[in-house]
Amino acid sequence: TAFVTFFPINPNNMGSSTVVNSRFKYWPKGKKIFQISHLKKINNPNLNTVFINKETPIRKILKLPKLILEIYKYLKYSQKKILLVEGASWIFYSFFTIFFIKRIIPDCKIIYISHSIESEIRKKYSNYFIYIITKILENLVFKISDLSTTVSNNEKKKIFKIYKKKTKLFPNAINLDNIKIQKKKIIKYLIYTGSYLYKPNKDAIDYLNYNIMPRLIKNFPQLKLVITGGGFNKKFPWLINKGIVSKKNLYNLIFNSECMCVPLKFGSGTRIKIIEALSLGAIVVSTTKGIEGIKLKKKDPPFILNSKKPIINTITKIIKNQKKLKKRIKIDKIYYKELYSMKNITKKFIASNLSMYFNEY
């Protein structure tokens, strides 16, 4: 099996890279990841990297033929020719790769793993031309792939409505095995994780800095906002910008926070950051859009709010009742950890859709 991504999966510091690494870990043996990356070389025998000097669409497009050639050399003599295309980048890269692999390796089974409905995001944040091209190519990718997946039943319904294409469910999931949390709290802080370069994250981070934190620090002068993910250069008196951090550090930051606040107004797919927080036993405050597609055991917590005043009031209550709320969600984290276990989800997906390729399933 060949996995292909058009973004770096190492270091493992983004939601999409977390999902890919977890999926790869629990996929049956006989596998390799092919990626386009601008980051320094990592010694990993299971990773084939096509390097670019700088992460730009043009540089990626120019390197696609080389990436396809590397995949071809790997799959050509394989008994089980399976290509998983991780669709967490511009759809053009996925379309180009699928189109040519289908022609040079006709017996290769191509699985398109959709992380979101990209045309929705492009419609909101890109110009009209890019949106139309994206929608056309996304439709073609769903049509020509042998199997396409979605991350939630909500996305599944949307894709059928937009493209009249049936998809298989392969939820975003994580691997929390052997994760050790250090219970250490020096300051009180809220946390938001995600690159500022991604427009939905930018809007959420700006909302926290301009609408939420100025009100909260009137009652809690020492309260901080911790952000991770990189791309942010602004200064605020309450802000602690951690940039890109390791998964170990990230999970400790999430667990020890007063809460993770995710005021997303727009987005597609399911938020790995929220799945991680719920599975770690952290308190989550989110908009309806932020928590969309996630199967909740119960609410309050997590708290689902869509306007400024309720968000501020709820965070105030969380800070005042932290220990009580943490105790309440201690059992809930077991539910989320099992429900969104990549090991369980991958095993189930293969048994339902690829059992003819993998006898052990």
Model-derived features: where do they sit?
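N-terminal subdomain of nucleotide-sugar transferases
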Residues: 1-41, 78, 215
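Conserved catalytic-core segment of nucleotide-activated headgroup transferases in glycan assembly
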Residues: 19-20, 25-26, 175-178, 184-248, ...
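Acidic donor-binding loop of glycosyltransferase active sites
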Residues: 146, 255-269, 280-283
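Carbohydrate-associated surface elements
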Residues: 154, 170-173
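Short hydrophobic beta-strand element within catalytic cores of glycosyltransferases
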Residues: 273-276, 283-287
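Conserved acidic donor-binding segment of nucleotide-sugar-dependent glycosyltransferases
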Residues: 301-309, 317-323
